[in-house]
Amino acid sequence: MNSEPTTLLQGTLDMLILKSLVAGEMHGLGISRRIQQITGGTFVVKPGSLFPALHRMEEEGWISSLWGDSENNRRAKYYRLTKPGRNQLEAETKRWGRISWAIAQALET
């Protein structure tokens, strides 16, 4: 398999952010690192994609945020998963399960 980072498919960024936050609250860089970790380096999320998505997801009520100090004593915005966010993650996980099954079926024919 190619070890180069892959472009995210439409609709996957929200799901990966929500999945990352299941582990606990994180700042933006932590979320980006977590996505890279849980995808085995397949997806690398750049700030230009991450922060607009975080802002939009906060407006949707899927995540909440608060300011705090990072591990190197710099101000950072920390994000956490909300109950509606957990519900959204569950729905997206089911949806992507159906999509991946259908694609696998199509590729086997």
Report each predicted region and the residues it spans.
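Amphipathic alpha-helical dimerization/coiled-coil segments
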Residues: R86-T109
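Intrinsically disordered, low-complexity and often Lys/Arg-enriched segments
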Residues: M1-N2
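A cross-family signal for key residues in well-ordered alpha-helices
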Residues: K19, R33, H55, E90, ...
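Basic amphipathic alpha-helical segments that dock to polyanions
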Residues: L50-M57
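Beta-hairpin "wing" of winged helix-turn-helix
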Residues: E58-R75, R80
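N-terminal helix-turn-helix DNA-binding core of bacterial DNA-binding proteins
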Residues: T6-S49
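Accessory beta->alpha helical hairpin/"wing" motif in late/C-terminal subdomains of nucleic-acid enzymes
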Residues: L81-G85
